[in-house]
A protein has these predicted regions:
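N-terminus-biased targeting/localization segments
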Residues: 1-10
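A conserved donor-nucleotide-binding helix/loop in the catalytic core
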Residues: 37-38, 100-112, 138-157
Length: 250
């Protein structure tokens, strides 16, 4: 058995045609990462505090704290049966915003909430879930590279049709970084096909570029990644991921 890790290889060719992410979510802003989507959204508003589930990516929490917004944590986790009660009892105040997280598309979180502050939802791991597609949140965010076979990418949209932040330009450093990650993805494909045997080569590229993503200035998304998203059948891709999960857990 070949050890191959969790970073995607180039594997979207079998899933071309049909409904794409842009068909499901036609009015979006694209960024180099999910963190950039948070930066753009929080910079677009004057929120003072953001409530974030304690079960969340702490690298992203650290990034948000650097945006001069006070982070408040609340108790939420996958399949939390008490999430509605927990959120509605939070001591929120004017100037707050709440982050909900779609945990793997199987969560109970799509419940209507009786709160008086804006809601952001993170659908990174549930892009094709009914919750994501029928969301009534003020804003939604996703780190696309966590769910799709692409090198980089983040997305922001508003189910309530709020005005989106202005588009940002594509930075040269993002193009260079994406090229490196696509090189790593290509080498990994060759590795899985027994055509390349130096795993450390593409692993080092993944590690190097992962560190670079953390320091990028807010940027738009490169053309190669946009082209992949524009042709990738989101339904067959997500179904394949589900089938892979089932195979791994037999």
């Amino acid at each position: 058995m070949i050890e191959f890790g969790s970073d995607y290889h180039l594997c979207g060719e079998k899933h071309i045609g049909g409904n794409t992410l842009f068909d499901v979510f036609p009015n979006v802003r694209l960024y180099a990462s999910g963190r950039h989507a948070f930066s753009a959204l929080l910079g677009h508003h004057d929120w003072k505090r953001i409530w974030i589930p304690a079960y969340f990516c702490y690298e992203v929490i650290t990034h948000i704290e650097q945006l001069h917004v006070t982070v408040k944590l609340y108790n939420d986790f996958p399949n939390n049966p008490n999430v509605k009660q927990t959120i509605e009892s939070l001591p929120t105040q004017e100037g707050d915003v709440l982050l909900r997280v779609n945990y793997f598309g199987i969560d109970l979180g799509a419940q209507a909430l009786d709160i008086d502050i804006p809601i952001i939802e993170d659908h990174t791991l549930g892009l094709n879930s009914e919750w994501a597609k029928s969301s009534t949140a003020d804003w939604c965010i996703a780190s696309l590279r966590k769910s799709l076979p692409i090198a980089i990418g983040g997305m922001l949209w508003s189910p309530k049709q709020h005005t989106l932040p202005q588009s940002v330009e594509l930075a040269n450093e993002v193009v260079e970084l994406a090229d490196k990650r696509y090189e790593a993805m290509s080498l990994k494909t060759a590795y899985l096909n027994h055509q390349f045997h130096k795993k450390d080569v593409f692993r080092n590229l993944y590690i190097e570029t992962e560190q670079q993503i953390e320091t990028l200035q807010v940027s738009g998304l490169d053309n190669r990644t946009i082209e992949i998203i524009a042709h990738l059948n989101i339904e067959t891709w997500m179904n394949a991921k589900t089938a892979n999960w089932g195979t791994a857990h037999r």
